[in-house]
Amino acid sequence: MDDGKMRNLRLRSELFRAIRDCFYRAGYLEVETPVKIHAPAPEEYIESVRAEKDFLRTSPELAMKVLLADGMEKIFQIGPCFRANESGRRHREEFTMLEYYSRGTGYRELAEFTAGFVAEAAERVLGSTRIEYGGKQIDLSAYEFVTVGGRLLQTDFGNLAESWYSCSCRLVS
């Protein structure tokens, strides 16, 4: 195996360990739900992968919500998911998804928890919360909670039309 592949496998393993540590520390229980299911989630924009008479899950969401309904409080799962017709450099039919739920926790608390574990995992795995993505430097610790209403209040609608017509768009195939 070449050095690049080995490095990526090690980074992936370290990342999953760091994420799990964050969830365990926060009192979450790791669960594992079936990958092969009888019926796909009814999402018109997500195409399921057939597996004989059944389907491969597109997300563990439904099975995890059953666990919440059964009384589980804080659960997470890292595991394989499948979506048909996903292809390209950044999309594959099979991928790994992190899904988590905390019953009774508000969306703002969940957003803050997410920002915290993302920054902590980056620091542990990469030694920094600063990453480069799409040619830009991003500081994962510089989390800012933004609401749609808050952004609308900050928007200069006088320049909105000008901004819209001056934007350059291109189709990506």
Predicted regions and their residues:
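Class II aminoacyl-tRNA synthetase catalytic cores and aaRS-like
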Residues: 1-173
